Amino acid sequence: YGDSPPYSQLFQKWAQKHLQNQFFPITTFLGRKDYINLINRMDIVVMYHNRQQAFGNIITSLSLGKPVFLKPNNPIYPMLKAMGVPNIYDINKIGNLNIKEICESAAKKREQCIVALKKYYSEQARLEYLVNLLK
């Protein structure tokens, strides 16, 4: 998001130093298949935004059974929690959690994520919303 070369370069430099081989910056457009493959190779997804951003990426990650860590002040966090979507975690608690256990548990909860998300984000949910809107 955004195209601020100084910030991007500064962040990439920091991440390479601190995260080393666990950091893979995406600097060019990836096709859908390549992007899905990239997410599938991730253990966890961290979205450290203060505002609503990357919603499609979050939904895709959850649909693939990935645990997603968000800031609790991000409006997406309480919304997904209220929807009953598992695999949403408070980024502020990441240091107190067993990431290996979370990853194993998240894969098992993938279907639950999909079911919870489809209640709100599916063709059927859209049609029901439109019918109610037009009543």
Regions picked out by a protein language model, each given a short descriptive name:
Residues 67-70:
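Short hydrophobic beta-strand element within catalytic cores of glycosyltransferases
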Residues 37-50:
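Acidic donor-binding loop of glycosyltransferase active sites
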Residues 10-29:
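Nucleotide-activated donor-binding/catalytic signature segment of Leloir-type glycosyltransferases, i.e.
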Residues 36, 56-64, 77:
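Short alpha-helical segment that forms part of, or immediately flanks, the ligand-binding pocket
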Residues 73-74, 78-84:
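Short acidic/histidine- and often glycine-rich active-site loop of Leloir-type glycosyltransferases
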Residues 51-55:
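Short glycine/acidic-rich beta->alpha loop that forms part of the nucleotide-sugar donor binding site
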Residues 25-38, 74:
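Conserved active-site histidine-acidic residue motif and adjacent donor-binding/catalytic loop
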